[in-house]
């Protein structure tokens, strides 16, 4: 059974709903002041085509809003936009609330699996702060896991990190038979090739009115940006694999960057004994994103699982 939800702007609980308070951010993280510019309209901003500026903005946002005192990632790793990433977290909280008499389950007993957590660790950092959930992050890149562990340790955060040692697997080797995760989340590689990734970067440069860079700006290593078959293939593989761990996860979810990919994913979902799936739209400024969620448990069983959290 399918359900659909649509929104018009950032989630109401998103701390960035009304934009950035640059005065607060520079007060909390003075290094940001070096990157503040004045726009033609006379407002303060930063140059979003400058990787160092974006990284420093993220450091300020994480410190001011999520109590993350230390956050540093290698230049080549993905530097995510915090507001959009946090939106996903808030909508996931609503997904759980739908099975818990409209109350958002909070606390360490809520288990969340982050597929492809990356060096940036953004979902465990923000989701842990907002709802105190316990996160397990996985990644195929040992260097990313190493950086993520350093961030967690420096901030004295209890985040479980696991390396996925087989690039052909998503859940296998990560989810054990005795595990029960209430959510999985994923920001999948959305390009089908390195050439597509380069073109995507060039489009972003053009939108910012800049000449293209010789490197993949906006951060991101190959495994973060593209995989064979693009996001449709990646998420389809995730759906196929989910059947083997159907009883270990209440809700499987993944971001879907392209609306046109939804139909193919719905067809894949219909090949499996899924009790319910949802497509949730998230409008973030000029960009509209969405995630797909599916569960092998019927609503009554999900409600019972949530009752056991109390």
Curated annotation (Swiss-Prot):
<protein>
    <recommendedName>
        <fullName>Ribosomal RNA large subunit methyltransferase F</fullName>
        <ecNumber>2.1.1.181</ecNumber>
    </recommendedName>
</protein>
<keyword id="KW-0698">rRNA processing</keyword>
<dbReference type="InterPro" id="IPR029063">
    <property type="entry name" value="SAM-dependent_MTases_sf"/>
</dbReference>
<keyword id="KW-0489">Methyltransferase</keyword>
<comment type="function">
    <text>Specifically methylates the adenine in position 1618 of 23S rRNA.</text>
</comment>
<dbReference type="InterPro" id="IPR016909">
    <property type="entry name" value="rRNA_lsu_MeTfrase_F"/>
</dbReference>
<dbReference type="InterPro" id="IPR010286">
    <property type="entry name" value="METTL16/RlmF"/>
</dbReference>
<keyword id="KW-0963">Cytoplasm</keyword>
<dbReference type="GO" id="GO:0070475">
    <property type="term" value="P:rRNA base methylation"/>
</dbReference>
<comment type="similarity">
    <text>Belongs to the methyltransferase superfamily. METTL16/RlmF family.</text>
</comment>
<dbReference type="GO" id="GO:0052907">
    <property type="term" value="F:23S rRNA (adenine(1618)-N(6))-methyltransferase activity"/>
</dbReference>
<dbReference type="GO" id="GO:0005737">
    <property type="term" value="C:cytoplasm"/>
</dbReference>
<dbReference type="Pfam" id="PF05971">
    <property type="entry name" value="Methyltransf_10"/>
</dbReference>
<keyword id="KW-0949">S-adenosyl-L-methionine</keyword>
<keyword id="KW-0808">Transferase</keyword>
């Amino acid at each position: 059974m399918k359900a659909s939800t649509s929104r018009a702007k950032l989630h109401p609980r998103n701390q960035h709903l009304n934009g950035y308070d640059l005065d607060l951010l520079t007060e909390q993280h003075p290094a940001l002041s070096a990157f503040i510019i004045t726009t033609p309209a006379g407002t303060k901003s930063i140059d979003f085509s400058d990787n160092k500026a974006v990284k420093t903005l993220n450091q300020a946002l994480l410190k001011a809003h999520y109590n993350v005192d230390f956050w540093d990632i290698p230049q080549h790793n993905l530097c995510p936009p915090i507001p959009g990433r946090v939106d996903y977290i808030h909508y996931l909280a609503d997904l759980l609330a739908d099975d818990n008499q409209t109350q958002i389950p909070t606390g360490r007993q809520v288990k969340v699996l982050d597929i492809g957590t990356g060096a940036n660790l953004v979902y465990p950092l923000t989701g842990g702060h907002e709802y105190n959930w316990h996160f397990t992050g996985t990644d195929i890149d040992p260097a990313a896991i190493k950086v993520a562990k350093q961030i967690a340790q420096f901030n004295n955060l209890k985040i479980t990190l696991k390396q996925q040692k087989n690039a052909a697997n998503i859940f296998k080797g990560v989810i054990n038979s005795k595990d029960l995760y209430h959510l999985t989340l994923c920001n999948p590689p959305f390009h089908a090739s390195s050439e597509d990734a380069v073109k995507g970067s060039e489009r972003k440069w053009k939108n910012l009115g800049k000449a293209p860079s010789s490197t993949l700006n906006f951060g991101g290593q190959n495994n973060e940006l593209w995989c064979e078959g693009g996001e449709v293939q990646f998420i389809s593989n995730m759906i196929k694999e989910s059947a083997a761990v159907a009883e270990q996860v209440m809700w499987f979810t993944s971001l879907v960057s392209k609306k046109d990919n939804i139909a193919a994913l719905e067809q894949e979902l219909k090949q499996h004994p899924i009790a319910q799936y949802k497509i949730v739209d998230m409008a973030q400024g000029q960009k509209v994103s969405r995630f797909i969620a599916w569960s092998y448990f019927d609503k009554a069983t999900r409600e019972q699982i949530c009752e056991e959290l109390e």
